[in-house]
A protein has these predicted regions:
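Conformationally flexible catalytic loops at phosphate/diphosphate-handling active centers
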Residues: 8, 128, 156, 160-216
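Glycine-rich phosphate/diphosphate-binding loops that line cofactor/substrate pockets in enzymes
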Residues: 14-27, 66-71, 160-165, 206-221, ...
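Active-site diphosphate/adenylate-binding microenvironment
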Residues: 14-17, 22-26, 32, 40-45, ...
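Short internal beta-strands
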Residues: 31-33, 105-106, 172, 245-252, ...
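Glycine-rich beta-alpha junction loops
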Residues: 36, 109-110, 173-179, 226-228, ...
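Thiamine diphosphate
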Residues: 38-110, 116, 270-271, 275-295
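Glycine-rich, acidic loop regions that bind phosphate or pyrophosphate groups
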Residues: 108-151, 254-370
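Glycine-rich phosphate/diphosphate-binding loop of Rossmann-like nucleotide-binding domains
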Residues: 221, 229-245
């Protein structure tokens, strides 16, 4: 066997990268062309993956953010180096603050120019250090210095973006690595890796303790956040609310996880919440927080006299979230559970039906909620039907709501 025959067949990384994304089910990539990512764009020309080209990188980042929110899967953003990456920063940071999964693939200067300060290199504190810009808000930032490591780094990037508390990650790739050739077997081995991690749930004993406390409570309230949407636990939440007859307040990110016209939905809390809603959460004896971070605006800057008064001698908190750091961050927690919301609510629903086969009695607060909605509707009729120009925001949203089916986003 000759030396030439013994060498494994190799292929361009850019071509293999695109095939990898196809295999993962990626259908769209958002970004803008630049000389550091042109090799990937060339490989995309014959691919089923559609490249959404925009006029500014911030647009691509916001588009990728919105796409991930709708699909529930990590979106892909392809960025040019330095100014391209900094232009995208606001959109990526916004996704990070809202826990939206995103894989940012950024081109960078050629690796053989490290230390020479080539065109558009970020190098004030270290050579080729543009990835450092993203460190404060991505879950992890990789700089790919070895071509052969890109396949496993990219696999880790997708898993990390979508697991636990989701969020963006950055894979920083020198432009010469996109055009390098490596053994396709390095990519093939990633196909054997699981594409979804098993998420933690809640044990029956803890579930029974939670149901017992909520059943014995005189004024329990649910407070739900965006974690319910990220877990796609809409049906499980509705079943739990209907069976337990507990009113539901929500954060800004939790709006829509239970239909606004559900008879037990109180509405948003905090600065943008109504007085009626804040009064219910303030006077609750037990609060079940689901997938929420108890952020400042949703909690009236945590002043105990406005929205939540949680602590000794006041409301008691049960908090379920996928991220351990969120438990007890802003309020003392009686029962804290690290779990995926969909899995946890399935267990809670099962245990609730075992303990309360017929459910709790209809909550008398339903009538007060209906009265409050009628009052607000009457109060807003004039603005929602106004013929004023420029158009009133209330009129715009009323018309959009009327024109769209209930389950559509205007």
């Amino acid at each position: 066997m000759t030396q030439e025959q013994s060498q494994p067949a190799k292929d361009l990384i850019s071509d293999q990268l695109v095939r990898y994304l196809e295999d993962r089910g990626v259908e769209h990539i958002f970004g803008l062309c630049g000389h550091t990512n042109i090799a990937v764009l060339s490989s995309l020309a014959e691919s089923s993956v559609r490249f959404i080209n925009v006029r500014h990188e911030q647009i691509s980042a916001h588009a990728a953010d919105g796409y991930a929110r709708v699909t529930g899967k990590a979106s892909v953003l392809l960025s040019h180096l330095s100014p391209g990456l900094t232009n995208a920063a606001t959109g990526v940071a916004n996704a990070a603050m809202d826990c939206i999964p995103m894989v940012v693939i950024a081109g960078d200067i050629p690796s053989y120019y490290y230390g020479k300060h080539p065109h558009q290199e970020v190098n004030l504190h270290a050579d080729a250090s543009q990835y450092e810009i993203y460190r404060p808000f991505v879950k992890r930032a990789w700089r790919v210095d070895t071509a052969e490591l890109l396949p496993e780094i990219l696999e880790k990037a997708f898993l990390l973006a979508e697991s636990g508390q989701p969020g963006p990650v950055l894979v920083n790739v020198p432009m010469d690595i996109f055009s390098a050739e490596i053994d396709p077997a390095l990519w093939d081995r990633q196909k054997a890796n699981t594409k979804e991690l098993t998420k933690p749930s809640i044990d029956d004993e803890t579930a029974r303790e939670i149901i017992t406390n909520l059943t014995n409570a005189s004024a329990p309230v649910l407070y739900v956040g965006g974690g319910v949407a990220l877990a796609k636990a809409y049906d499980e939440l509705r079943d739990f609310v209907d069976h337990m007859q507990i009113p539901v307040s929500h954060s800004l990110m939790g709006k829509g996880v239970l239909a606004d016209d559900h008879p037990l939905v109180l509405g948003m809390t905090g600065f943008w919440g109504m007085k009626f809603t804040n009064e219910q959460t303030l006077n609750a004896d037990w609060i079940l927080g689901l997938g929420t971070r108890f952020k400042e605006a949703d909690c009236s800057s945590w002043y105990p006299q406005y929205t939540f008064n949680i602590g000794e001698g006041a409301s008691k908190l049960i908090h379920i979230d996928i991220e351990p750091q969120e438990i007890g961050r802003n309020y003392p927690t009686e029962i804290g559970v690290i779990a995926d919301l969909k899995s946890a609510l399935k267990v809670l629903n099962r245990v609730a039906r075992e303990m309360l086969p017929d459910g709790r009695k209809p909550n008398p607060l339903i009538e007060k909620i209906a009265d409050e909605r009628s009052r607000l509707a009457a109060q807003n009729v004039e603005m929602q039907t106004s013929e004023a120009f420029p158009m009133m925001p209330d009129r715009i949203f009323a018309d959009l709501t009327a024109a769209n089916p209930p389950d559509e986003t205007p």
